Structures are given as C-alpha cells and as structure tokens.
C-alpha cells in the first residue's frame, strides 16, 4: 500500500511541478509549448534563449524525489583556452555567486542551479530561472573575451 501511495505522491508532485514551471515560463514571457524540448535524461524539458546563451529547464527523477535543474551553456572551449586558468577563475566566481555554480561537461562551461521539487513554489521556480539566465548573460561575454572559446553551445 505504501508503494502505491508513494507513486501517487510522485505523480502528483510531477504534475504540479510541470504546471509551476510552465506558469513561471509564461510569467517570464515564454510560451511553454513553443520552448518544450526533448531530453532523454529528463522527464520534462524546456529551452530558454537569452542573449547568446541557451538555458535548459529540466525535471529529472532522483531516488528520493524529482529535481528541478536550470542549466545554461555559457561558453564552449576550444584548444586555445588555458583551461587551468579558466577553471581556477570559475572556482573563484563560484565563491561569490548565490545559489548557482559553474561546472563543465566536455568542452562546455555551464551555469547550474538545482533543487528538489518537494515544497517548491512559483517564486522559487522564477528565482532559479532568473538567476541562472541573468548570471549566464552577465558572465558569458566576459569569460570568452578573457579566456577565448566561443559563446554558448
């Protein structure tokens, strides 16, 4: 009986989180159906263009609960980039940022915020999306100018 209840709780949480994300996207001026995308690792995904970066909002299954992740591709590295200097700089930036962190995936520099969807509300979804898109837009040109590479993916 408890596994059925747990499954229903997950399904209810997922449905309400999709509604929250789509309400947040609408409030930010985006049509959720128009920016919905496929991501094989996510239950649901949307892509938001802002400036030269592309931000992906995803809902992913984790052992304990579903998680909301907001991830912007800030820049793509090439062979000329001094990775050690860039990575040291990104770590320094991480210490000054609120609620987000720079990360890498292959040759891409990402800016990521993530949290459980448990007790999530609209203001938190809006804040995560705004924070990631704003920080990505503020830092992408500066990072590419200083270290090389190219903007976005």
Describe these PLM feature segments:
Residues 69-108, 112:
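Short, internal acidic amphipathic alpha-helical interface segments
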Residues 143-153:
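Short, highly charged C-terminal tails/helix-capping segments
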Residues 6-9, 71-76, 121, 125:
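Short histidine-centered catalytic/ligand-binding loop motif
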Residues 40-76:
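Hydrophobic-cavity lipid-handling domains and compact docking modules
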Residues 1-54, 104:
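Charge-rich, low-complexity N-terminal segments
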Residues 134-138:
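Long, contiguous binding/interaction regions
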Residues 11, 15, 80-81, 119-126:
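Ordered, soluble secondary-structure elements with a strong preference for glycine-centered loop motifs
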Residues 101-133:
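A short, solvent-exposed beta-edge/loop patch
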């Amino acid at each position: 009986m408890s596994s059925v209840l747990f499954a229903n709780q997950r399904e209810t949480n997922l449905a309400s989180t999709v509604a929250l994300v789509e309400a947040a996207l609408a409030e930010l001026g985006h049509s959720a159906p128009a920016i919905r995308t496929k991501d094989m690792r996510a239950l649901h995904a949307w892509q938001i263009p802002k400036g030269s970066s592309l931000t992906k909002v995803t809902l992913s299954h984790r052992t304990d609960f579903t998680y909301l992740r907001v991830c912007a591709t800030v820049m793509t590295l090439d062979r000329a980039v001094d990775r050690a200097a860039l990575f040291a700089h990104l770590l320094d930036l991480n210490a000054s940022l609120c609620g987000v962190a720079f990360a890498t995936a292959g040759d891409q520099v990402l800016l990521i915020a993530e949290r459980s969807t448990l007790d999530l509300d609209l203001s938190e979804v809006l804040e995560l999306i705004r924070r990631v898109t704003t920080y990505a837009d503020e830092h992408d040109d500066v990072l590419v100018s200083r270290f090389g590479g190219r903007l976005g993916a």
